[in-house]
From Swiss-Prot:
Positions of the Guanylate cyclase domain: 421-549
Catalyzed reactions: GTP = 3',5'-cyclic GMP + diphosphate
Name under which the protein is recorded: Soluble guanylate cyclase 88E
Quaternary structure note: Homodimer, and heterodimer; with Gyc-89Db and Gyc-89Da, in the presence of magnesium or manganese.
Gene: Gyc88E
EC number: 4.6.1.2
SMART domains on file: CYCc (SM00044)
InterPro entries in the record: A/G_cyclase (IPR001054), A/G_cyclase_CS (IPR018297), H-NOX_domain_sf (IPR038158), Heme_NO-bd (IPR011644), HNOB_dom_associated (IPR011645), HNOB_dom_associated_sf (IPR042463), NO_sig/Golgi_transp_ligand-bd (IPR024096), Nucleotide_cyclase (IPR029787)
Compartments reported by the entry: Cytoplasm
Function as written in the Swiss-Prot or TrEMBL entry: Heterodimers with Gyc-89Da and Gyc-89Db are activated in response to changing oxygen concentrations, alerting flies to hypoxic environments. Under normal oxygen concentrations, oxygen binds to the heme group and results in low levels of guanylyl cyclase activity. When exposed to reduced oxygen concentrations, the oxygen dissociates from the heme group resulting in activation of the enzyme.
Cofactor(s) needed by this chain: heme
Inhibition and activation profile: Probably not activated by nitric oxide (NO). Homodimer is slightly stimulated by the NO donor sodium nitroprusside (SNP) but not the NO donor DEA-NONOate or the NO-independent activator YC-1. Heterodimer also exhibits some stimulation, some compounds (SIN-1 and two of the NONOates) that were ineffective at stimulating Gyc-88E alone did stimulate the heterodimer.
C-alpha cells in the first residue's frame, strides 16, 4: 500500500478533528512517523489499524468514518494534480465509471506496485446502472462509495444514491455489487448512435493481421483460429490451441469465458503467458537480460488491448500490444523494434522511454532522498519540540502552558486555591560568606545547593516557584490540588536541612546552614507578564511564610499554627511559643523536628552534585620541605598544627636545631641525606617555625578519625552512607583558582617586565618561574663581585689607605694594580663584541651544575649600597655529602627538650659538594660552592634582563642560558684572580713575619701557637668577647665572612689559612687592640683582613 492513502487518512483527521486528535491516534496506534511519503510502500494492514484506532478515539462508526474519508480523498488528490486526470476521464458519468479500470492503468506508471481494484458496469439504464467492484483488499467498501458519490457531485454536478446490494468473498477477492441511481440520460444517446446503419468495407485478413501483429482470433470454444505476424514468430504453437491453456486473464477480474468477455467489451483486457517465453530462445549474452539495478526482468509475455466481437465471423478478436517497460524486457521476450506496429506510438514510446528512464530514475532517487531528509527533519523537529515542551513545563506548569498554547489570555489562567503550603529557605550569613569568597565561588555554591533542592522537589512532589539570590521557594497544593500538601512541604523542609550538611562553606570549611519557614493558607496563582512569564503566587499566605523563614534560626524548620493543624501526629513538633511577626502581631509558632519512619536520603549516582569549578585546575605553589618519598598513599593536605594534633602528642615532638637563612625566606631546602634523618612531623615543625606560615604537608593515613577531622577542618566528619548526595567541598576550587588569590603584588613596577608575586589564601608566596630565581641569583652575585672589584681596585697601591695595624697583612681581596674596568651603564645588555661571540658559546646543558639558594622577592632590598653593607660572600669548607653523620651535625647539631620554636642561634646554612681531588683549589669549575644569602637578603637587581619580545620562545631560552653561562664563567675567573692575589699577599706577610720573629713566637701548632705568629688575646678580653656573642635570632646585626682554604705554614709555600673569619658587632664591645670594631670570636683570630674590609664594608 502506497502512502497516498495513509496521508489521505492523516489529513482528513487533522482537518476535521484537529492536530491533537491525530497525534493521540498515532501514539495509541504505535506509529512513530508523524507523516507519510506519497510514493513509499507501507504494510497493507497499517491503514486498517489506524482507521480502527481513529474510530475508537473519535467515537464514530466504521461506515461514517470510511465514507467521509473517501469523500475527502477527491479533494485531497487535487493537491498532487490528479484532479485534472479525473476531470478528463469521461464526458459523462457513465463514461467515467466505464473508464475506471483505465484510470488505474494510467496510475501504474507512477505507482508500479499498485494493487488496483476492478470496476465493471452492467444493466445500464437512463436511471442508473449496476457496478461490480472487485479488490484484493478488505475494508474499502464504504471508502469506495464515498469516492464515487463525491466524483459525481464535484465533476459532473449530479446527486448519486449508492445502495450496497451484495458483498461476497471469493477466495482472496472481495466482490461487491452496487446499485447506482443517478441521471443517466447519456445512455439513451449512446443507444441511438449504435442503431444507425453502417456500411461494411471489405478488408483482407492478411492486411488485418499485418496492422495488428499481436492480435488473436478465437471462437466460442476458446480455440485460437488465427494470430498476428509477430505473435506467430515467438509463439508459433499457439495456433489451434485453447487460449486459456496459454494465457491467463489478469484484468478485468472476471472469468476467462467467451460469454463473460462479450459483456465486458468496454474494459481493457490484459493477458499474460502461462509459461515464460525466454526458454524458447537461446540468448548468448546473459548480461543483456539483467536490469540496471541487477534484478531479473519478467520472462512472460504480457499483452494489453481490447476485445472486439466480429459479428460476421462470430468470433472475438483480441487487439493487443506487448507491455514492454524497457529494452531489457524486449530482449528477454525475443522481440525487436520492427516487430511492433507502425501505425501507433509503440516504437516511439519504447525508444523515448529508454532515453528518459535514466533521468526519471535520477529524479526518483533525488525525490526519495529528499523524502528521507524531510522525515529526518521532521523527527528532529519533534525532538526539539519535546525538549522545548520540557523546558516550558519547568518554567510554567503543564496545565497552564497548555491553556496558553490554545490561545487563552494569561490573566484567565489565574486561579484561587483555598489551601496550599508554602516553604521559604535561605542561607544563614550569606552576605558574609559572599564577602569572603569570589563571585565564581558564590555561583558554584548556589548551583550545587539548588541542584540538590531541585532533586528533592521531585522526591517530595512539590512545585518550585522561584529562587532569588539564596532564597528558595516551593509550594504544594498548587497548581495541582493535593489534600496532603502540608505533609509534602514538611518532608521537603526536613530533607533540605539534612541535605545541606553535605555542602561546605568555601570560606570556613564548615557545612552551610539554612533556616526554613513553612505556612499554609489560601493564595491566588497564575501567569503574570507577557515577556518572560512566570507562575506566581499572591496573597497574605506568601508573606506569612516569608516571616516564618526570617524569624527562624539556623538548621531549624519553623512552622505556623495553620501548618501544624494540617500535618499528622507522626511529626515531632516542639512549641516555640508566641513571637512578634512583622505585620501580623503575636503568633504561636512551632519547631518541626522529625517525622516518624521517614525514608532516609538514599545515595544514588544520578543525584550526586558537584560544584562548578570556575577556572581550570592549576597547581598552586606551596611552601614545602624536601622530603624522602613516602610509599604509602597520602591523605589530603592539612595544616601542620591539625596534623600534629591528630597524629602525635606534643610532648613526643623533639626540638630540632635548624640552620636557616631568615624568617623572611619562604622555603626551607634540605638535602636528601639530611632529610632522611628527620620525620615528616619534624620537617613540618621546622618549616612552620622558619616561615611563619601554615605549611601543608602530606601525612600518611593515621586513623580514620584523625583523617576525617583534618579533612573537615578540625570537626569530625560523620559518614553519611544513607544520603543521596556526596559531600561537596569548595577547598579544591579555591586552591586551584589563580583568580581567587587575595594577594597579587608586583615588585618594582618600573621594570619593563614586572616580576609578579602571588600568594594564596594560606600566605604562601611563590615566584613566577624557577628560571627567574636562578637568573636573579646569578645576576646578583655577578653584580656584587663587580662592586667588590671596583671598590678594592680603588684601594690598590694606595699607601694612605694602609691598615694602621702592624699585624694585619695586605688586604687579601685586592685584585692588583691593574686599572679598574669601567662599569657599563647597563650591565645586563651585551656589548657588541659579546653579542657577536654569542653563537660560539657552549650550550647551557654543558655548563657545570651549580646549586643556588632562592629567596622571596618581597624581602629583597633595592639599594646596592645597603646591599654592600649587608651581604657577605663566604666560601665555607667542603663537607662530605655522603656522610649522614656529618650532615646531621650541620643540620641538627644538638637535640634538646626545648620547645620546637626555641631555635638555637642562627648560623649560616652551608651546602657544599665534595671536590674531585685533594689538590683542586676551591672555587674551580669541578667543585661546586653554594651561595648563602643572609638576613636581610638582597633585593633582586634592577638590571635583570628584560624579555626580548621580538624573539621566539626558543631564542629567549637561549638568550637567558647564554647570559647565565657568561655570569658563571666571569665568577670563576674573578675567584681565580682573588686566590692568586691572596696567595701572593700571604707569601709576602709570611716573609715579613719571618724577618721579624724568626722561628720564635708561636709557629708551633702542636704547642698551641698561632699559625700567624701572633700572640693570643688577653684572657679577660676573650671572655668578655665571648659573653657578647649573639645567642638568638634577634641579634640581627651579625655579619660574618669566611673563605675555605687549605692548611698553611710559614715554613712552606704561602697558602691560605685553614679557616679565618671575623665578626662585626655594631654595639662595639671588647675589640682587637689595633682597631676598633673588631674582636675575637669562637677562639679564632679574626683580625687578619678586617682593616681593609672595614673601609669597604
Amino acid at each position: 500500500m502506497y502512502g497516498l492513502l495513509l496521508e489521505n487518512l492523516s489529513e482528513y483527521i487533522k482537518s476535521v478533528y484537529g492536530e491533537e486528535k491525530w497525534e493521540d491516534i498515532r501514539r495509541q496506534a504505535g506509529i512513530d512517523s508523524p507523516s507519510f511519503s506519497v510514493h513509499q510502500v507501507y504494510p497493507e494492514n497499517l491503514l486498517q489499524k489506524l482507521a480502527k484506532k481513529a474510530q475508537q478515539v473519535l467515537g464514530v462508526s466504521e461506515r461514517d468514518f470510511m465514507d467521509q474519508m473517501g469523500v475527502y480523498f477527491v479533494g485531497f488528490v487535487g493537491q498532487y494534480g490528479y484532479d485534472r486526470v479525473l476531470s478528463v476521464l469521461g464526458r459523462h458519468m457513465r463514461d467515467f465509471l466505464n473508464g475506471l479500470d483505465n484510470l488505474h492503468e494510467y496510475l501504474k506508471f507512477s505507482y508500479p506496485r499498485m494493487r488496483a481494484p476492478s470496476f465493471i458496469c452492467e444493466n445500464e439504464t437512463k436511471q442508473g446502472l449496476t457496478l461490480h467492484y472487485r479488490s484484493k483488499r478488505r475494508g474499502f467498501v464504504y471508502y469506495t462509495m464515498g469516492q464515487i458519490r463525491e466524483v459525481a457531485r464535484y465533476f459532473y454536478h449530479k446527486e448519486m444514491h449508492i445502495e450496497l446490494v451484495r458483498e461476497e468473498i471469493l477466495f482472496d477477492t472481495v466482490h461487491v455489487t452496487f446499485q447506482l441511481t443517478f441521471d443517466n440520460r447519456a445512455f439513451t444517446l449512446a443507444s441511438l448512435a449504435m442503431t444507425r446503419e453502417e456500411k461494411h468495407l471489405p478488408i483482407s485478413a492478411h492486411v488485418l493481421f499485418e496492422i495488428f501483429p499481436f492480435c488473436m482470433v478465437f471462437g466460442a470454444d476458446m480455440v485460437v483460429r488465427s494470430i498476428g505476424n509477430s505473435l506467430m514468430v515467438i509463439l508459433p504453437e499457439l495456433l489451434g490451441k485453447k487460449i486459456t491453456a496459454w494465457f491467463d486473464l489478469v484484468r478485468p477480474l472476471i472469468a476467462f469465458k467467451f460469454q463473460t468477455i462479450l459483456n465486458r467489451t468496454n474494459n481493457i483486457f490484459e493477458l499474460v503467458t502461462v509459461d515464460p517465453v525466454t526458454e524458447r530462445f537461446d540468448v548468448q549474452n546473459e548480461d543483456l537480460l539483467q536490469h540496471e539495478d541487477g534484478s531479473e526482468p519478467e520472462k512472460s509475455l504480457r499483452l494489453k488491448g481490447q476485445m472486439v466481437y466480429m459479428e460476421n465471423w462470430r468470433m472475438i478478436m483480441f487487439l493487443g500490444t506487448p507491455v514492454m517497460p524497457d529494452l531489457t524486457s524486449l530482449i528477454t521476450t525475443g522481440l525487436y523494434i520492427n516487430d511492433l506496429s507502425m501505425h501507433d506510438f509503440s516504437r516511439d514510446l519504447m525508444l523515448a522511454g529508454t532515453q528518459q528512464s535514466v533521468e526519471l530514475k535520477l529524479a526518483l532517487d533525488q525525490e526519495q532522498q529528499k523524502s528521507k531528509k524531510l522525515e529526518e527533519s521532521m523527527r528532529l523537529l519533534d525532538e526539539e519540540m519535546r525538549r522545548t515542551d520540557e523546558l516550558l513545563y519547568q518554567m510554567i506548569p503543564k496545565q497552564v502552558a497548555d491553556r496558553l498554547r490554545r490561545g487563552e489570555n494569561p490573566i484567565d489562567t489565574c486561579e484561587m486555591f483555598d489551601s496550599v503550603s508554602i516553604l521559604f529557605s535561605d542561607i544563614v550569613t550569606f552576605t558574609e560568606i559572599c564577602s569572603r569568597i569570589t563571585p565564581m565561588e558564590v555561583v558554584s555554591m548556589l548551583n550545587a545547593m539548588y541542584s540538590i533542592f531541585d532533586k528533592l522537589t521531585e522526591r517530595n512532589s512539590v512545585y518550585k516557584v522561584e529562587t532569588i539570590g539564596d532564597a528558595y521557594m516551593v509550594v504544594a497544593g498548587a497548581p495541582d490540588k493535593d489534600a496532603n500538601h502540608a505533609e509534602r512541604v514538611c518532608d521537603m523542609a526536613l530533607d533540605m536541612v539534612d541535605a545541606i550538611t553535605d555542602l561546605k562553606d568555601p570560606s570556613t570549611g564548615q557545612h552551610l546552614r539554612i533556616r526554613v519557614g513553612v505556612h499554609s493558607g489560601a493564595v491566588v496563582a497564575g501567569i503574570v507578564g507577557l515577556k518572560m512569564p512566570r507562575y506566581c503566587l499572591f496573597g497574605d499566605t506568601v508573606n506569612t511564610a516569608s516571616r516564618m523563614e526570617s524569624t527562624s534560626i539556623a538548621m531549624k524548620v519553623h512552622i505556623s499554627e495553620s501548618t501544624k493543624v494540617l500535618i499528622g501526629p507522626n511529626y515531632k513538633i516542639i512549641e516555640r511559643g508566641e513571637i512578634d511577626v512583622k505585620g501580623k502581631g503575636t503568633m504561636g509558632t512551632y519547631w518541626l523536628e522529625e517525622r516518624e519512619n521517614r525514608l532516609p536520603l538514599q545515595l544514588t549516582a544520578a543525584l550526586q552534585v558537584h560544584p562548578l569549578s570556575p577556572v581550570p585546575p592549576t597547581p598552586t605553589p606551596k611552601t614545602k620541605a624536601i622530603m624522602p618519598p613516602v610509599s604509602k598513599p597520602l591523605t589530603p593536605m592539612m595544616p601542620v598544627s591539625v596534623s600534629l594534633a591528630a597524629s602525635m602528642p606534643t610532648s613526643n615532638v623533639p626540638a630540632v636545631d635548624v640552620m636557616a637563612s631568615s624568617s623572611s625566606i619562604s622555603g626551607l631546602a634540605l638535602t636528601a641525606a639530611a632529610a632522611a634523618h628527620m620525620s615528616l612531623h619534624h620537617q613540618a615543625v621546622v618549616a612552620e617555625a622558619l616561615t611563619g606560615a601554615s605549611v601543608e604537608v602530606a601525612l600518611p593515613s593515621v586513623a580514620s578519625g584523625a583523617t576525617g577531622a583534618a579533612a573537615g577542618g578540625g570537626a569530625p566528619s560523620d559518614d553519611r552512607n544513607s544520603r543521596i548526595y556526596s559531600p561537596v567541598t569548595f577547598k579544591d576550587v579555591a586552591r586551584r583558582s589563580v583568580a581567587n588569590s587575595p594577594v597579587r603584588s608586583c615588585a618594582q613596577p618600573d621594570q619593563e617586565r614586572r616580576r609578579e608575586s602571588r600568594s594564596n589564601s594560606t600566605g604562601h608566596v611563590f615566584m613566577r618561574t624557577p628560571s627567574e630565581i636562578f637568573g636573579s641569583l646569578i645576576l646578583d652575585t655577578e653584580e656584587f663581585l663587580e662592586d667588590l672589584q671596583i671598590s678594592r681596585s680603588s684601594l690598590a697601591n694606595n699607601n694612605n689607605n694602609q691598615s694602621p695595624c702592624g699585624f694585619s697583612p695586605t688586604p687579601p681581596f685586592r685584585i692588583g694594580s691593574a686599572p679598574p674596568k669601567p662599569r657599563p651603564s647597563n650591565p645586563d645588555k651585551f656589548t657588541p663584541e659579546e653579542l657577536a661571540a654569542m653563537d660560539q658559546l657552549t650550550p647551557p646543558s654543558t655548563a657545570p651544575a651549580r646549586e643556588t639558594a632562592s629567596c622571596s622577592s618581597a624581602s629583597l632590598d633595592r639599594d646596592k649600597a645597603t646591599k654592600l653593607k649587608k651581604i657577605t660572600f663566604s666560601n665555607s669548607s667542603s663537607l662530605d655529602a655522603t656522610t649522614p653523620t656529618a650532615l646531621a651535625a650541620v643540620v641538627c647539631p644538638m637535640r634538646t627538650k626545648s620547645p620546637p620554636m626555641a631555635v638555637a642561634p642562627v648560623m649560616h646554612m652551608v651546602q657544599a659538594s665534595t671536590s674531585k681531588g685533594d689538590g683542586q683549589r676551591p672555587g674551580s669549575k669541578d667543585s661546586v660552592s653554594s651561595i648563602s644569602l643572609h638576613s636581610p637578603p638582597p633585593h633582586r637587581s634592577n638590571s635583570a634582563p628584560a624579555r626580548p619580545h621580538s624573539m621566539s620562545k626558543a631564542a629567549r631560552k637561549a638568550f637567558l642560558a647564554a647570559k647565565q653561562t657568561k655570569a658563571m664563567e666571569k665568577l670563576d675567573k674573578m675567584i681565580e684572580e682573588v686566590q692568586e692575589v691572596e696567595s701572593q699577599s700571604v707569601a709576602k706577610a709570611a716573609n715579613m713575619r719571618l724577618a721579624l720573629y724568626g722561628h720564635d713566637g708561636g709557629g708551633d701548632l702542636a704547642a698551641g701557637g698561632c699559625p700567624l705568629f701572633l700572640p693570643p688575646p688577653p684572657q679577660q678580653q676573650q671572655q668578655q668577647q665571648q659573653s657578647l656573642m649573639p645567642s638568638s635570632i634577634s641579634d640581627s646585626g651579625l655579619c660574618s665572612h669566611g673563605h675555605s682554604h687549605a692548611p698553611s705554614c710559614h715554613h712552606m709555600d704561602p697558602k691560605m689559612t685553614n679557616s679565618q673569619s671575623f665578626q662585626h658587632s655594631p654595639r662595639g664591645g671588647i675589640t682587637h687592640q689595633c682597631c676598633s670594631g673588631f674582636g675575637h670570636g669562637n677562639g679564632r683570630h679574626s683580625h687578619r683582613m678586617h682593616s681593609n674590609a672595614c673601609r669597604i664594608l
